[in-house]
Protein backbone atom coordinates (compact mmCIF):
# COMPACT_ATOMS: atom_id res chain seq x y z
CA UNK A 1 0.00 0.00 0.00
CA UNK A 2 0.95 3.64 -0.50
CA UNK A 3 -0.03 6.20 2.15
CA UNK A 4 -0.12 9.79 0.86
CA UNK A 5 -1.30 11.50 4.08
CA UNK A 6 0.76 11.05 7.25
CA UNK A 7 2.33 12.89 10.14
CA UNK A 8 5.53 10.92 10.74
CA UNK A 9 8.14 13.65 11.21
CA UNK A 10 8.89 14.27 14.88
CA UNK A 11 8.74 17.64 16.63
CA UNK A 12 7.25 19.71 13.79
CA UNK A 13 3.44 19.56 14.28
CA UNK A 14 0.90 17.54 16.29
CA UNK A 15 2.42 14.27 15.11
CA UNK A 16 5.26 12.34 16.80
CA UNK A 17 7.18 14.13 19.53
CA UNK A 18 10.40 12.10 19.26
CA UNK A 19 12.48 9.95 16.92
CA UNK A 20 11.25 6.91 18.85
CA UNK A 21 7.60 7.81 18.22
CA UNK A 22 8.33 8.34 14.53
CA UNK A 23 9.98 4.92 14.33
CA UNK A 24 7.06 3.23 16.11
CA UNK A 25 4.60 4.75 13.61
CA UNK A 26 6.70 3.64 10.66
CA UNK A 27 7.02 0.12 12.05
CA UNK A 28 3.28 -0.24 12.63
CA UNK A 29 2.48 1.14 9.18
CA UNK A 30 4.93 -1.32 7.61
CA UNK A 31 3.45 -4.19 9.61
CA UNK A 32 0.05 -3.33 8.13
CA UNK A 33 1.38 -3.60 4.59
CA UNK A 34 2.32 -0.01 3.71
CA UNK A 35 5.54 0.23 1.69
CA UNK A 36 5.56 3.91 0.65
CA UNK A 37 4.63 6.80 2.94
CA UNK A 38 4.41 10.45 1.94
CA UNK A 39 5.24 12.66 4.91
CA UNK A 40 2.67 15.48 4.99
CA UNK A 41 3.47 17.61 8.04
CA UNK A 42 1.04 20.46 8.66
CA UNK A 43 1.57 23.86 7.11
CA UNK A 44 -0.97 26.14 8.76
CA UNK A 45 -0.45 29.82 9.48
CA UNK A 46 -1.16 30.70 13.10
CA UNK A 47 -1.13 27.07 14.26
CA UNK A 48 1.74 25.08 12.72
CA UNK A 49 4.52 27.42 11.63
CA UNK A 50 7.63 25.27 12.00
CA UNK A 51 10.31 26.63 9.64
CA UNK A 52 10.59 24.69 6.39
CA UNK A 53 14.27 24.10 7.09
CA UNK A 54 13.51 22.26 10.34
CA UNK A 55 10.76 20.15 8.75
CA UNK A 56 13.13 19.17 5.93
CA UNK A 57 15.97 18.44 8.36
CA UNK A 58 13.82 16.22 10.61
CA UNK A 59 12.31 14.54 7.55
CA UNK A 60 15.77 13.45 6.42
CA UNK A 61 16.32 11.93 9.86
CA UNK A 62 13.00 10.06 9.56
CA UNK A 63 14.07 8.76 6.16
CA UNK A 64 17.17 7.29 7.85
CA UNK A 65 15.02 5.85 10.65
CA UNK A 66 12.89 4.13 7.99
CA UNK A 67 15.95 2.17 6.86
CA UNK A 68 16.15 0.71 10.37
CA UNK A 69 12.52 -0.44 10.04
CA UNK A 70 12.83 -2.08 6.61
CA UNK A 71 14.96 -1.86 3.47
CA UNK A 72 11.90 -1.56 1.24
CA UNK A 73 10.08 1.17 3.18
CA UNK A 74 10.12 4.32 1.03
CA UNK A 75 9.55 7.76 2.58
CA UNK A 76 8.62 10.69 0.30
CA UNK A 77 8.24 14.41 1.04
CA UNK A 78 5.06 16.47 1.01
CA UNK A 79 2.79 18.69 3.08
CA UNK A 80 -0.75 18.98 4.35
CA UNK A 81 -1.53 22.56 3.42
CA UNK A 82 -4.28 24.48 5.19
CA UNK A 83 -5.72 26.79 2.56
CA UNK A 84 -5.08 30.51 3.05
CA UNK A 85 -4.00 33.24 0.66
CA UNK A 86 -0.59 33.04 2.35
CA UNK A 87 -0.40 29.32 1.53
CA UNK A 88 -1.48 30.04 -2.05
CA UNK A 89 1.37 32.53 -2.41
CA UNK A 90 3.87 30.05 -0.95
CA UNK A 91 2.66 27.33 -3.33
CA UNK A 92 3.11 29.70 -6.25
CA UNK A 93 6.67 30.50 -5.12
CA UNK A 94 7.35 26.79 -4.48
CA UNK A 95 8.12 27.56 -0.84
CA UNK A 96 5.99 24.66 0.41
CA UNK A 97 6.07 21.20 -1.14
CA UNK A 98 3.57 19.32 -3.24
CA UNK A 99 3.28 15.52 -2.89
CA UNK A 100 6.67 14.04 -3.84
CA UNK A 101 7.34 17.11 -6.01
CA UNK A 102 4.40 16.23 -8.28
CA UNK A 103 1.57 18.35 -9.69
CA UNK A 104 -0.58 17.17 -6.74
CA UNK A 105 -0.90 19.04 -3.43
CA UNK A 106 -2.74 17.86 -0.31
CA UNK A 107 -5.12 20.66 0.71
CA UNK A 108 -7.25 20.99 3.84
CA UNK A 109 -9.84 23.43 5.16
CA UNK A 110 -11.53 23.86 8.52
CA UNK A 111 -14.56 21.71 9.28
CA UNK A 112 -16.84 24.72 9.03
CA UNK A 113 -15.45 26.38 5.89
CA UNK A 114 -18.30 27.32 3.55
CA UNK A 115 -18.67 25.58 0.20
CA UNK A 116 -18.11 28.88 -1.57
CA UNK A 117 -14.76 29.33 0.18
CA UNK A 118 -13.73 25.73 -0.53
CA UNK A 119 -14.67 26.11 -4.20
CA UNK A 120 -12.84 29.44 -4.53
CA UNK A 121 -9.72 28.18 -2.76
CA UNK A 122 -9.45 25.07 -4.91
CA UNK A 123 -10.05 27.12 -8.07
CA UNK A 124 -7.16 29.40 -7.08
CA UNK A 125 -4.86 26.40 -6.63
CA UNK A 126 -5.90 24.90 -9.98
CA UNK A 127 -5.03 28.21 -11.64
CA UNK A 128 -1.44 27.74 -10.45
CA UNK A 129 -1.30 24.49 -12.44
CA UNK A 130 -1.42 22.49 -9.21
CA UNK A 131 -3.94 19.67 -8.79
CA UNK A 132 -5.56 19.63 -5.33
CA UNK A 133 -6.08 16.40 -3.44
CA UNK A 134 -8.72 17.40 -0.89
CA UNK A 135 -7.71 15.96 2.48
CA UNK A 136 -10.28 14.01 4.52
CA UNK A 137 -13.40 15.18 2.67
CA UNK A 138 -15.57 13.56 5.35
CA UNK A 139 -14.62 16.36 7.75
CA UNK A 140 -16.28 19.23 5.94
CA UNK A 141 -19.81 20.16 6.92
CA UNK A 142 -20.31 21.88 3.55
CA UNK A 143 -19.87 18.54 1.72
CA UNK A 144 -21.99 16.37 4.02
CA UNK A 145 -24.38 14.14 2.04
CA UNK A 146 -23.86 16.38 -0.96
CA UNK A 147 -22.91 14.35 -4.00
CA UNK A 148 -23.51 17.32 -6.30
CA UNK A 149 -20.92 19.52 -4.58
CA UNK A 150 -18.26 16.82 -4.43
CA UNK A 151 -18.84 15.93 -8.09
CA UNK A 152 -18.50 19.61 -8.98
CA UNK A 153 -15.09 19.74 -7.27
CA UNK A 154 -14.01 16.53 -9.02
CA UNK A 155 -15.21 17.87 -12.39
CA UNK A 156 -13.13 21.02 -11.77
CA UNK A 157 -10.05 18.81 -11.61
CA UNK A 158 -9.72 18.00 -7.90
CA UNK A 159 -9.23 14.61 -6.28
CA UNK A 160 -10.51 13.39 -2.94
CA UNK A 161 -9.06 11.54 0.04
CA UNK A 162 -10.72 9.99 3.09
CA UNK A 163 -9.04 8.78 6.29
CA UNK A 164 -8.64 5.05 6.87
CA UNK A 165 -10.07 5.24 10.40
CA UNK A 166 -13.34 6.61 9.05
CA UNK A 167 -13.79 3.52 6.86
CA UNK A 168 -14.25 1.35 9.96
CA UNK A 169 -17.71 0.74 11.42
CA UNK A 170 -18.94 3.19 14.08
CA UNK A 171 -19.07 1.88 17.62
CA UNK A 172 -22.48 1.75 19.27
CA UNK A 173 -21.49 3.98 22.19
CA UNK A 174 -18.97 6.73 22.74
CA UNK A 175 -18.02 7.14 19.08
CA UNK A 176 -16.93 10.77 18.80
CA UNK A 177 -16.48 10.65 15.03
CA UNK A 178 -19.48 8.54 14.09
CA UNK A 179 -20.76 11.30 11.80
CA UNK A 180 -17.48 11.30 9.85
CA UNK A 181 -17.68 7.55 9.36
CA UNK A 182 -21.22 7.96 8.00
CA UNK A 183 -20.01 10.67 5.63
CA UNK A 184 -17.09 8.52 4.46
CA UNK A 185 -19.46 5.64 3.74
CA UNK A 186 -21.76 8.00 1.79
CA UNK A 187 -18.83 9.10 -0.41
CA UNK A 188 -17.57 5.54 -0.94
CA UNK A 189 -21.01 4.28 -1.92
CA UNK A 190 -21.28 7.00 -4.56
CA UNK A 191 -17.77 6.42 -5.94
CA UNK A 192 -16.58 9.89 -4.92
CA UNK A 193 -13.29 8.80 -3.32
CA UNK A 194 -9.94 8.58 -5.12
CA UNK A 195 -7.61 7.72 -2.23
CA UNK A 196 -7.77 6.27 1.27
CA UNK A 197 -4.84 7.35 3.46
CA UNK A 198 -4.03 7.12 7.15
CA UNK A 199 -3.53 10.71 8.40
CA UNK A 200 -1.65 8.94 11.19
CA UNK A 201 -0.23 11.07 14.01
CA UNK A 202 0.62 8.61 16.81
CA UNK A 203 -0.03 5.05 17.96
CA UNK A 204 -2.38 6.03 20.79
CA UNK A 205 -5.23 8.09 19.38
CA UNK A 206 -4.45 8.31 15.65
CA UNK A 207 -2.72 5.15 14.38
CA UNK A 208 -2.66 4.00 10.72
CA UNK A 209 -5.74 1.67 10.38
CA UNK A 210 -4.68 0.98 6.79
CA UNK A 211 -4.90 -2.81 6.84
CA UNK A 212 -8.30 -2.74 8.53
CA UNK A 213 -9.65 -0.18 6.04
CA UNK A 214 -8.24 -2.11 3.06
CA UNK A 215 -9.91 -5.31 4.21
CA UNK A 216 -13.28 -3.60 4.78
CA UNK A 217 -13.26 -1.95 1.34
CA UNK A 218 -12.12 -5.15 -0.41
CA UNK A 219 -14.95 -7.06 1.24
CA UNK A 220 -17.63 -4.44 0.60
CA UNK A 221 -16.60 -2.96 -2.76
CA UNK A 222 -14.25 -5.60 -4.18
CA UNK A 223 -10.50 -6.23 -4.36
CA UNK A 224 -10.15 -4.10 -7.51
CA UNK A 225 -11.62 -1.02 -5.78
CA UNK A 226 -9.40 -1.53 -2.72
CA UNK A 227 -6.29 -1.72 -4.91
CA UNK A 228 -7.38 1.42 -6.75
CA UNK A 229 -7.82 3.44 -3.53
CA UNK A 230 -4.78 2.15 -1.60
CA UNK A 231 -2.25 1.36 -4.35
CA UNK A 232 -3.01 2.45 -7.92
CA UNK A 233 -4.28 6.01 -7.45
CA UNK A 234 -1.74 6.89 -4.72
CA UNK A 235 1.03 5.55 -6.97
CA UNK A 236 -0.15 7.72 -9.86
CA UNK A 237 -0.09 10.75 -7.56
CA UNK A 238 3.48 10.23 -6.35
CA UNK A 239 4.62 9.34 -9.89
CA UNK A 240 3.00 12.57 -11.16
CA UNK A 241 0.68 10.70 -13.52
CA UNK A 242 -2.95 11.39 -14.36
CA UNK A 243 -5.54 9.43 -12.41
Curated annotation (Swiss-Prot):
Keywords: Capsule biogenesis/degradation, Exopolysaccharide synthesis, Hydrolase, Manganese, Protein phosphatase. Its EC number is 3.1.3.48. Pathway: Capsule biogenesis; capsule polysaccharide biosynthesis. One of its GO terms (biological process) is capsule polysaccharide biosynthetic process. Changing residue 199 to N: Loss of activity. Its cofactor is Mn(2+). GO terms for molecular function: manganese ion binding; protein tyrosine phosphatase activity. It catalyses: O-phospho-L-tyrosyl-[protein] + H2O = L-tyrosyl-[protein] + phosphate. InterPro entries: Caps_polysacc_synth_CpsB (IPR048208), Caps_polysacc_synth_CpsB/CapC (IPR016667), Metal_Hydrolase (IPR032466). The keyword Manganese applies. It comes from the Bacteria. Dephosphorylates CpsD. Involved in the regulation of capsular polysaccharide biosynthesis. NCBIfam families: caps_synth_Cps4B (NF041488). Belongs to the metallo-dependent hydrolases superfamily. CpsB/CapC family. This is Tyrosine-protein phosphatase CpsB. It comes from Streptococcus pneumoniae. The lineage of its organism: Bacteria, Bacillati, Bacillota, Bacilli, Lactobacillales. The gene is cpsB.
Amino acid sequence: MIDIHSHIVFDVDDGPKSREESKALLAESYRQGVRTIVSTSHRRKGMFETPEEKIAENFLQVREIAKEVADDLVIAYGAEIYYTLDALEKLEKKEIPTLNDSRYALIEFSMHTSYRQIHTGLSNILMLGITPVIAHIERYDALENNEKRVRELIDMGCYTQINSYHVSKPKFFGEKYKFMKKRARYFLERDLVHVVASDMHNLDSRPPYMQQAYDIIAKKYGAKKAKELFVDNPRKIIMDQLI
